[in-house]
């Protein structure tokens, strides 16, 4: 019997070999990540008049009521902005009775403001696959900021397999951090500053820029087509504008605009844990943070020659009204689960983990951002296609990069 927890890479491979996860033509081994499986879109996209959940019916039965047409994805097809599509995935499931699954967009998908969620037969919730599920998987896709082109076989989201109840409570998280530090300061911190824990680990936004003239990106309202299969092909300025705080040090988020920002803290996920960016807390502001939620074991474990941890890039959208952000404001939360076993290969270990050393990295489709240069003496650093490792700059870390932050639970917040 599988130990309780998130299933690691070797256990996912076993699910595939036993036929619990299957696809015509097999499943590429490269799609199996340390704690998740990349799912591939199929050959047809159905254009919908609205989103839906099947409830007491199969997806294909209810699809007939909402379908407005079909697109052939075998040669590539264009998906329009703000139009929902439903795409059958190549992978199907026949899960053992003790295993359930949960889906999230891939990092590269979320950074393009492409909203995705998995739908199952008889499903009452998006992105949740019940224990012992047998059947097809479908992906709802809604491009928000850009018109995109996709082709069958492309991967837009991931599936994480879980047994038992592996969620770490606050005490467990504090203890895990004591054994192997999880969060580190990404910039100068005040003496005694702590990272806060309350049903997960809070992360705050970095509006310092750490030596650059801007602190993030805002998606442009562009009619240009973005082919997701192309790499390092598009100019940043055609799709993004750089944003910076106002004279008071605040960044004003405009309603329904999409922003890429970065966490002030650096995060390192131990090999025995998996993390997920939790849904936004509406009491913290009308914000949606982080479409792409999975952080695999080994994320931020950049090696002995670098400062530990990696910044989390935050995908943020304000709703209804403008919203003011300040440097260091808590913006999102990481929740943690135990692994059923450590993965045989960790994130960043030859698996094409593009964002392991990121500061503020755009998707792989974009060229290096030559408008985002950081100059230190005669040394010129770029970020974009090759994310910067600014943690190594002495004036960015103030010599404190190696010291983990102390964690404090909500009990000590006086709330």
Model-identified regions with their sequence ranges:
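DUTPase catalytic domain/fold
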Residues: 1-415
């Amino acid at each position: 019997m599988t130990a309780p927890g998130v299933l690691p890479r070797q256990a996912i491979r076993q699910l595939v070999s036993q036929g619990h996860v299957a696809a015509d033509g097999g499943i590429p081994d490269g799609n199996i990540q340390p704690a998740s499986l990349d799912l591939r879109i199929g050959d047809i996209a159905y254009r919908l008049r609205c989103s839906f959940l099947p409830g007491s019916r199969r997806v294909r039965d209810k699809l007939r009521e909402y379908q407005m047409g079909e697109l052939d994805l075998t040669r590539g097809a264009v998906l329009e902005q703000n139009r929902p599509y439903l795409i059958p995935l190549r992978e199907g499931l026949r899960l053992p009775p003790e295993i359930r699954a949960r889906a999230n967009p891939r990092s590269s998908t979320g950074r393009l403001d492409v909203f995705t969620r998995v739908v199952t037969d008889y499903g009452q919730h998006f992105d949740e696959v019940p224990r012992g599920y047998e059947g097809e998987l479908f992906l709802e896709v809604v491009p928000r900021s850009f018109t995109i082109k996709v082709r069958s076989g492309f991967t837009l989201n991931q599936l994480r397999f879980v047994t038992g109840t592996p969620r770490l409570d606050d005490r467990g998280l504090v203890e895990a951090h004591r054994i192997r530090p999880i969060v580190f300061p990404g910039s100068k911190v005040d003496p005694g500053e702590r990272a806060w824990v309350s049903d997960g680990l809070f992360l705050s936004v970095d509006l310092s820029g750490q030596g650059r003239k801007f602190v993030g990106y805002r998606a442009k309202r562009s009619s240009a087509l973005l082919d997701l299969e192309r790499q390092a092909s598009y100019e940043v300025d055609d799709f993004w504008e750089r944003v910076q705080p106002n004279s008071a040090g605040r960044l004003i988020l405009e309603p329904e605009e999409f922003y890429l920002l970065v966490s002030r803290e650096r995060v390192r996920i131990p090999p025995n844990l998996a993390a997920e960016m939790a849904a936004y807390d509406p009491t913290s502001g009308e914000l949606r943070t982080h479409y792409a939620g999975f952080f695999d074991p080994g994320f931020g474990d950049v090696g002995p020659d670098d400062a530990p941890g990696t910044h989390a890039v935050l995908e943020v959208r304000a709703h209804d009204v403008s919203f003011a952000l300040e440097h260091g404001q808590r913006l999102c939360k990481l929740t943690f689960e135990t692994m059923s076993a450590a993965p045989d290969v960790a994130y960043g270990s030859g698996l094409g983990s593009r964002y392991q050393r990121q500061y503020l990295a755009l998707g792989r489709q974009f060229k290096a951002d030559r408008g985002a240069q950081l100059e230190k003496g005669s040394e010129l650093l770029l970020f974009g296609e090759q994310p910067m490792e600014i943690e190594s700059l002495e004036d960015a870390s103030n010599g404190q990069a190696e010291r983990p932050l102390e964690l404090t639970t909500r009990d000590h917040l006086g709330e």
